[in-house]
């Protein structure tokens, strides 16, 4: 499932090709995604200029003259830039034409979306309750410490809650907690200020390093240039249950938390 680094990688890959250009056509081949694509967009978008392209959590935001297109990649979605002569594949569900280049959306499992908001996009129902960006100034050790007080849920579940902080998906939660030396099953409310400092630092580091590597490719994800991400080659714990810890050489423990794979070192993480 594309997470924050994959979405950021996509944004950086496609935006230079379309920013400032006008939409010349919107071709919707399959409107039935997680939520139906508004068919009226085919008439509304042509002629509008792409003013800005940004990311909020795992959502891509394309800002035009009269509103904002909100795109989510779902479980298996990807966006890529193609030439007009390149024929669509079976799972390519919509094309946003910008003259001689096309922003093409592919989604085999169809859990993604293309929605439209004419008003303040940050007040959209999908965005207004989101927590701070993990790479932004508002995500601080003090913030994490205060939000975690009296919380009895496991710290891994806590940092994966998008109302606490956005974009820390399962892979990156596993990796960040290992680097910070914190067991994923530790109660969030039991974190000290020093632990919060370490965890914020390592969440930032892991996400930034993944962005630099183009994201993590486990199944369907490819970046905006159609190439896979390479962060998977640097994973320390995720997907390595039973293998030797790269720090202490003891076997990594794998458990299920909220039906998600969780891997950690019982020696290095406290």
Curated annotation (Swiss-Prot):
Keywords: DNA damage, DNA repair, DNA-binding, Glycosidase, Hydrolase, Lyase, Metal-binding, Multifunctional enzyme, Zinc, Zinc-finger. GO terms for biological process: base-excision repair. InterPro entries: DNA_glyclase/AP_lyase_DNA-bd, Formamido-pyr_DNA_Glyclase, FPG_cat, MutM-like_N-ter, Ribosomal_uS13-like_H2TH, Znf_DNA_glyclase/AP_lyase. Its EC number is 3.2.2.23, 4.2.99.18. A zinc finger (FPG-type) spans 236-270. It catalyses: Hydrolysis of DNA containing ring-opened 7-methylguanine residues, releasing 2,6-diamino-4-hydroxy-5-(N-methyl)formamidopyrimidine; 2'-deoxyribonucleotide-(2'-deoxyribose 5'-phosphate)-2'-deoxyribonucleotide-DNA = a 3'-end 2'-deoxyribonucleotide-(2,3-dehydro-2,3-deoxyribose 5'-phosphate)-DNA + a 5'-end 5'-phospho-2'-deoxyribonucleoside-DNA + H(+). Binds 1 zinc ion per subunit. DNA binds at residues 91, 109, 151. SUPFAM superfamilies: Glucocorticoid receptor-like (DNA-binding domain), N-terminal domain of MutM-like DNA repair proteins, S13-like H2TH domain. HAMAP family: Fapy_DNA_glycosyl (MF_00103). NCBIfam families: fpg, PRK01103.1. Belongs to the FPG family. Involved in base excision repair of DNA damaged by oxidation or by mutagenic agents. Acts as a DNA glycosylase that recognizes and removes damaged bases. Has a preference for oxidized purines, such as 7,8-dihydro-8-oxoguanine (8-oxoG). Has AP (apurinic/apyrimidinic) lyase activity and introduces nicks in the DNA strand. Cleaves the DNA backbone by beta-delta elimination to generate a single-strand break at the site of the removed base with both 3'- and 5'-phosphates. This is Formamidopyrimidine-DNA glycosylase. It comes from Cellvibrio japonicus (strain Ueda107) (Pseudomonas fluorescens subsp. cellulosa). The lineage of its organism: Bacteria, Pseudomonadati, Pseudomonadota, Gammaproteobacteria, Cellvibrionales.
